[in-house]
Each structure stands twice: as C-alpha cells, then as structure tokens.
C-alpha cells in the first residue's frame, strides 16, 4: 500500500478500508524526502503500532526504500502476516458492526468479516445480493443500522465516513507534526479540503 506522505490524511482513509480486507500489508511511505523538506515529522513507530502494519520509508523519485518495501511485502504475503484491525469505529457504530458480524458469521470468510459488516452497514446492494441473506438476518442488520442513524442523526454512509476521518485525525495528532506554519496549506491539502467537503463535493463531481 503506497501512501503519499505529503497527503497522508487522504491516503490513510484508503488504508483503513484496505485493512478491513484482512490481506497482508506493508505500507510504503512515499515522498518521505519531500515531507522532510517541508519540515513534517512522522513518527513511523507510533503509526505502525496503531495501524498494525510495518511501514517502510521510500522515495520513488530518488529510488530509495523501494527494494526494501518490496522485500517486506513479499515476506508478509508469504507468511500471511496480518496485524490486528485498528479500532477505527467506536461507540454505537462499533456495537452495530459487531452485531452484524455475529449475524453473518459462518457465511463469509472470517478474514473479510469486518469488510462485509461495514458494507452491510452502508447498505451496499451488491454485497447484500452476493450473500443471499435470510429475511431475518436482513431485518436484524437493518434494525442495527437504523438505530445508529437515529442516535447519530445521520445516514449510514456518512456515519462510516465521519468515523474513519475521526480515527485518522487522532492518528495525525499522535504521530504527525506538519512543518508548515499553522494555517498554511499545500496545494494538495487545499484541493482535499474542497473535494471532501460534504456540501461542495457533489456539485464539483457533477461538473466534471
């Protein structure tokens, strides 16, 4: 999993999704030379411990760390090494996901149990059709999701998105210190702020 260290927040969002697949992973923290030049400080040990995966610093432009990252990835795949799932979700959302896991236990590969639970929480139609769940199980899932939506006054997909970003924000506070002056954003950061804005994102994509 290649992570752009200069846009780490956006990249970590995808990382949280990939971790739910239960696939052996090594993170290649790319463009680390640019991050250092910007004065950014990333505590790789803290980040690695929190995510449960090994992190290798790389610079594709300078050809640094790529071989080591590839070797680590090959070793992880060979040994089927997977870390524990990070605690991305909390409170009633985690409770609902755990309940969904109980409802579908035995129906899916245990490695992918959390991924399926999240997709069912989001009411992913393709996943629902794929699993061919009984009406009783579907009802139990819907009750768990609806209860969360009512408690949090939001829709299921937004709840998942918001909790991912809340988790990433905690990671950033604990393991990442930006070198730029407070309030100074890179071009990439500015673009991220706009395209991930819940109000502006849809009109922007509609125009594209």
Mark where each language-model region is.
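Short flexible coil/turn linkers enriched for glycine and charged/polar residues
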Residues: 21, 49, 185, 197-201
């Amino acid at each position: 999993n290649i992570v752009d260290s200069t846009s780490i927040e956006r990249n970590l969002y995808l990382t949280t999704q990939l971790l739910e697949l239960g696939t052996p992973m090594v993170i290649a923290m790319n463009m680390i030379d640019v991050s250092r030049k910007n004065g950014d400080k990333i505590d790789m040990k803290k980040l690695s411990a929190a995510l449960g995966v090994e992190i290798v610093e790389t610079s594709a432009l300078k050809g640094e760390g790529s071989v080591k990252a590839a070797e680590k990835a090959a070793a992880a795949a060979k040994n089927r090494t997977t870390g524990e799932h990070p605690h991305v979700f909390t409170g009633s959302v985690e409770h609902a996901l755990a309940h969904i896991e109980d409802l579908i236990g035995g129906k899916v590969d245990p490695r992918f149990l959390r991924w399926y639970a999240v997709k069912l929480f989001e009411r992913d139609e393709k996943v629902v059709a794929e699993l061919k769940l009984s009406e009783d199980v579907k009802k139990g899932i819907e009750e768990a999701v609806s209860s969360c939506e009512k408690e949090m006054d939001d829709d299921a997909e937004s709840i998942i998105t918001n909790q991912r970003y809340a988790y990433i924000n905690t990671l950033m506070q604990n393991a990442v210190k930006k070198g730029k002056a407070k309030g100074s954003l890179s071009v990439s950061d500015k673009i991220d702020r706009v395209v991930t804005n819940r109000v502006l994102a849809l009109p922007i994509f509609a125009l594209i």
